[in-house]
Amino acid sequence: MNQKSCNKCIFTMLSESSYGVEFLKVIGVYAVLSLVTLRIKLFVTPNWFDPGGLVTNHYMLTRWKYTNNEQSRVLQWLIPDGLHDLTGWTIPEAYMFQRWFFVLLAFVCFHFFLRKWFKAPAAFGAVCFLAAVMPLSYMNYLQESFSLLLFSFVLILWLIREKLNWQYAVVLLLASMNNETVLILPAVFFFYNFKTWKFKPLCKLTGLTLLTCAPAYIWSAWIRFFTVYICDTQHLGGGWHLDVNLHNLWFSLGISPFQYWKAWYLYIIFVFGLLWLFAYLRFKDKPLFLRRASLMIPLFIICHLITGRIEEVRQMLPLAFIIVPMGMIYMFPELKIEIS
């Protein structure tokens, strides 16, 4: 069979399933959406091309001489470094491809993750909403673990929902090598699988939760020890930001609405807008998985208020995979196809 015939057979095989046809329809649109978000990111990030920016940072990362948390997020710089070696692309080009490709995968994965509960047009709209709010998170800094974090976060949620426990453990480990934010997701695993307060089932679930997340936590502890105590890297900006975050949030609430466009500390509210509220209205009508997963959200926000700079609203974007479908079920209940 020649290559053309083989390609035709693959195309036909994909087209035989309704989801295959849907995939072929949406992937091109999402590829362009990912390109649009990349173009905006590059426009607002001169550091990408400055001599002392991305290339210099990458050089220091590959020699274990950069700052944490970036140094510990090894996949964010190992993948572009591998692309650079394999293809001959420049370092900025390799990082461009990484961001474009993983954001595309996140869009596709989010679309089909939602198809359990929504018809295709609603899933498509949810992805477009995510693409529309992503530029709000873009600032002139380099946080290139973001794209793979976005993809891995929704993929792990999907694996937890389908109770694919060992696949979840493997992906969680790999994702933790890119960004430690995914370490919150074992809470979703526990909440979703919780059934009773009886001692024996509770101990069994606790043990399974700890067992499946142990590799990711062990890796994260080791890489942090290695980078801090062996490589002597410093934590950029420190690890305590609660007082600054709360002060600036309170201050920003009092500024003129005409200044909201640069009120970075309010972006945590703006990024999902009323969907923050809609997600919790008629809560019992939401699917069990989303209700249980949403219990993680307060923990997620508190952790970022304490250890992160909350004006960097990209930190909230992974919550879109929970907040957006919950809000949409309240807004458009007629579009849901299954609640479970």
Predicted stretch roles:
Residues S34-T45, T67, K198-D285, P318:
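Membrane-lumen/periplasm interface segments of specific transmembrane helices
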Residues F97-W117:
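Transmembrane-helix motifs of polytopic, lipid-linked glycan transferases
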Residues F110-A132:
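Transmembrane-helix signature of polytopic, membrane-embedded enzymes
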